[in-house]
Amino acid sequence: MKVSKAIVALAALCMALLAPAAGSKELTNIDGDLNNRHLRQESAELATTPEEIGVKKDSNNPLQRRDQALVSAHRVYDPVSGLACALVGDCMACPTSEKDETFCRETGYRQELDCPRPKDPKDAALLTKPEDEREIRFKACSPADTARPGVEVVKFEVRNVLS
């Protein structure tokens, strides 16, 4: 009985170690319609400029201030200002001095955001663009699980064999 459990555990170990590599190969070999798809920004015949449609540029909207083709696909929106921010660095544990902050209360981890400073509506004579002024904010995050998912299966099988 122990021998059969050991064989099953060994087979699970082999499958767990090979599964991520096999999955990544399959993802790179996707063919068919997916290769023929294009984003609207990449296709000249489908792309339309705001002037052609008649869209008025809104300088208060952070997404209309710049060319949409240049905007990163991975945006993070700051819940306080509503502006599009860029992620800076990795998810890190909150220091004890910041444990009471809203972004640290949820998970105990934080990630730095580089956000544009919102324009003060009372200051009409502001000479700089709001996107030129940046400020650092934080958002709650959870640390990335760096362990491979197959390792948990192997650990489970080994515990079953040993018990």
UniProtKB/Swiss-Prot annotation:
Q: Give yes or no: UniProt keyword Nucleus.
A: no
Entry keywords, A to Z: Host cell membrane, Host membrane, Membrane, Secreted, Signal, Virulence
Specify whether Secreted is a keyword of the entry.
Answer: yes
Coiled coil ranges (UniProt) are none
> Where does the secretion signal sit in this chain?
1-23
| Compartment(s) where it occurs, according to its Swiss-Prot or TrEMBL record | Secreted; Host cell membrane
* Ranges spanned by the short sequence motif RxLR-dEER, renumbered to the chain: 37-52
Name the source's superkingdom: Eukaryota
Cellular component GO terms, alphabetical: extracellular region; host cell plasma membrane; membrane
Q: What does this protein do?
A: Effector that enhances P.infestans colonization of Nicotiana benthamiana leaves.
Q: What is known of its domains?
A: The RxLR-dEER motif acts to carry the protein into the host cell cytoplasm through binding to cell surface phosphatidylinositol-3-phosphate.
Protein family: Belongs to the RxLR effector family.
Q: What is this protein called?
A: RxLR effector protein PITG_13625
Q: What organism is this sequence from? A: Phytophthora infestans (strain T30-4) (Potato late blight agent)
